[in-house]
Amino acid sequence: MKNIQLIIFVLTGLSSFLGRSQETLPIYSDYLSDNVYLVHPAAAGIGNCGKLRVTARSQWSGVNDAPSLQTLSAHNRIGDNIGLGFILFNDKNGYHSQQGFQGTFAYHINLSRPDDVNQLSFALSLMAVNNSVDESTFVIPDPVISQIVRSESYFNADFGMAYHNKGFFSYFTAKNIMLNARSLYNSKFESLNLRRYLITLGYYFGESKNLQFEPSVMMQAIERTGEKFADFNMKVYKKVANAQLWAAFSYRKSFDNAGTLDLNYITPIIGVNYKNYMVSYTYTKQTGDILFDDAGYHQISLGWNFLCKAPRSSGCPNINASF
């Protein structure tokens, strides 16, 4: 029975890893925790504050070697038009892991007066990633297993665009635009094409009201498999003294999955911005016909806004920090 559970765990982890972690940084719901830059490079330096963010995510609580992800990111505007940013991440899933560094250059074009929000942005991210497979603890005899830690490094790039007009915001990102030949995994299952396309649309309103609302949708498409996903999101803000309380709810739905499993995710998020600091908690529940574990996914995000400038006349919280 234990061997059957081990095999199921390895196969589940392997399919999850090949399906996502080879595509550099995995895409979850971090962007709803005031961390849009993790998903869209055009958000680098886009607002009136520099932003430092740390996230820690764990899956399948109580399961040994379950997937986990940690990120450290920062970005800020330099001068009037240039944004710079970086991301460090560590992604582990059972015997598989990857560590990466991403650096971003963004250019922001103001289409109206400097104190208004009417801005077009372009960005390019370059990244270096090291993938590894730890075979040293494998207990299943197989002549093709070397029982060492095998690793391989490669490079990739993301391109992004964004447009903001007062409370309206939109992003487009093409991820992993370079084709990479790698020998770490079986070429029958590992494609050169890791491209993924993302579009985010949203609107922030109620700035003068007791509550502010931010509905948004993020759509994803994977070029190689034809998979399509959409996140339907609602975020609510409320200012209390020197703090801003907020909560978000996200529903990720898969469409036309080209023969893959129909997996959907429900994600509630709660957070608070106090002066220049931010903390949030994210819980994700997976739904579908086949589930490895019912424990869900947990994430903590911490943030610090630095070198803040005067806010512009109107804009979403990603443009104008709370304090």
Task: Briefly describe each language-model feature range.
Residues M1-I7:
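Bacterial N-terminal signal peptides that target proteins for export
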Residues I8-S16:
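Bacterial N-terminal signal peptides
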Residues F17-S21:
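Sec/Tat signal peptide C-region and signal peptidase I cleavage site
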Residues Q22-F323:
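Subset of outer-membrane beta-barrel
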